[in-house]
Amino acid sequence: PKQNMELDILTAVSPIDGRYRSKTAALAQYYSEYALMKYRVRVEIEYFIALCELPLPQLEAFPHHLFDTLRDVYRNFSEKDASHVKEIESVTNHDVKAIEYFIKEKFDAIGGLDNFKEFIHFGLTSQDINNTSFPMMLKESLAEVYVPLLQRVIDALNARAEEWKEIPMLAKTHGQPASPTSLGKEVRVFAYRL
């Protein structure tokens, strides 16, 4: 079998990223490797800021006005940044360590932060970062993609239920005819269940 296939929609590991990409594209910003990197950067930076706010004695001198600049690192995280993280990872052979080094490079770019760089990832394991990133990915994808789409389905069902509330239909119980109902009432049951 061919070992080094170029990645595209036909060679993706799953049809979710191939055949069904048009249906799942909105989820890429939450579940792609790029997204995981962005969430990891966010967790690392917010943790660093939290250490500054404690204040951890060694970080008392960190200029708090730079917090927004630090947050811009994940807010503006790009595919180019993700590619750079992959380059770092090719040397470190460790995905979370590559994120740490990436953030240290950003500290260098800001300038004057050398004394604080060793507190990036301070007291953490990779799983601390992952076990925070993954729930955030799930929570935000549900809130920003899934629930709004589900609400559209519920709204459409409720609209049909209202429109069809006067249309009579025979109900059944245990496969036998029962008291009459309305099509609208029965459709509203499905909206309620969702």
Regions found by a protein language model. Give the residues of each.
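A helix-coil-helix interface module used to build multimeric assemblies
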Residues: N4-R193
